């Protein structure tokens, strides 16, 4: 069954990766370094080549990376000339900064998925903001710019989360369908689930830290192409004016 982000938050709890990452003992207070021109240029998402108001589009999104299987996923996306959106965890970007740069360089979109993958509504205001702002700074150092999109871990959100995101210039992105790939752990079933959830203007939630998901993507891309879909980033799918700071997409 398609799980929609406008449903009760209880549904969202099963949609994201299993465990929160442990915070290090101290948060970094270092200011963001100035990005080189090359890094800043590589961080710009590819311009939309299609008008999703006129053609059939879908956005594949991947949470919780970068991880050990992200490079293979990027190889597959490049081979099939498909774009995707990656919601990255700040702590993991620090561990795999080159992968984050590659995601940006190859024209995919990058979003903020918090620093340590905690449920944001459960945090006091300062810690909630720190989870997002620290990741903004990590990504600024890694790819030369701060993202404009965020996705709350587990899909847990409320008015405080949206307000904090808005103050940091971030729009919230949820989904129209989740594969529950982290629990399925089966290549065929994950692929079948994506294809069942696919619909025009859909936003599909997956995880590039799940190896079976990465293995499923070649078949998914081939089948979606056969169905006439353009594989685009969330921003290309949303179009102008729908991803303002503090906004939530899809509605």
Regions found by a protein language model. Name each.
Residues 1-35:
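Secretory targeting and sorting signals
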Residues 118-146, 154-202, 213-216:
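Alpha-helical scaffold elements lining the catalytic groove of polysaccharide deacetylases
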Residues 55-57, 80-85, 105-109, 145-148, ...:
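Loop/turn elements at helix/coil->beta-strand transitions in domains of secreted/extracellular proteins
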């Amino acid at each position: 069954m398609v799980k929609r982000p406008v449903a009760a938050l209880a549904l969202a709890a099963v949609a994201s990766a299993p465990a929160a990452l442990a915070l290090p003992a101290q948060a970094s207070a270092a200011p963001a370094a100035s990005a080189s021109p090359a890094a800043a240029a590589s961080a710009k998402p590819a311009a939309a080549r299609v008008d999703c108001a006129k053609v059939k589009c879908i956005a594949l999104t991947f949470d919780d990376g970068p991880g050990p299987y992200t490079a293979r996923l990027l190889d597959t996306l490049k081979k099939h000339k498909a774009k995707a959106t990656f919601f990255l965890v700040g702590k993991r970007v620090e561990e795999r900064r080159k992968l984050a740069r590659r995601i940006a360089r190859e024209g995919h979109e990058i979003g903020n998925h918090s620093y340590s993958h905690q449920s944001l509504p459960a945090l006091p205001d300062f810690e909630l903001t720190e989870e997002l702002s620290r990741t903004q700074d990590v990504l600024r150092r890694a790819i030369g710019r701060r993202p404009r999109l965020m996705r709350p871990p587990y899909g847990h959100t409320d008015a405080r989360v949206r307000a904090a995101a808005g103050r940091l210039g971030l729009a919230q992105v949820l989904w129209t369908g989740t594969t529950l790939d982290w629990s399925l752990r089966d290549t065929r079933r994950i692929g079948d689930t994506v294809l069942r959830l696919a619909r025009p203007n859909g936003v599909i939630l997956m995880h590039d830290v799940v190896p079976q998901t990465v293995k499923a993507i070649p078949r998914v891309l081939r089948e979606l192409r056969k169905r006439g879909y353009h594989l685009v980033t969330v921003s290309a799918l949303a179009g102008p004016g729908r991803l303002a700071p503090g906004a939530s997409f899809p509605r």
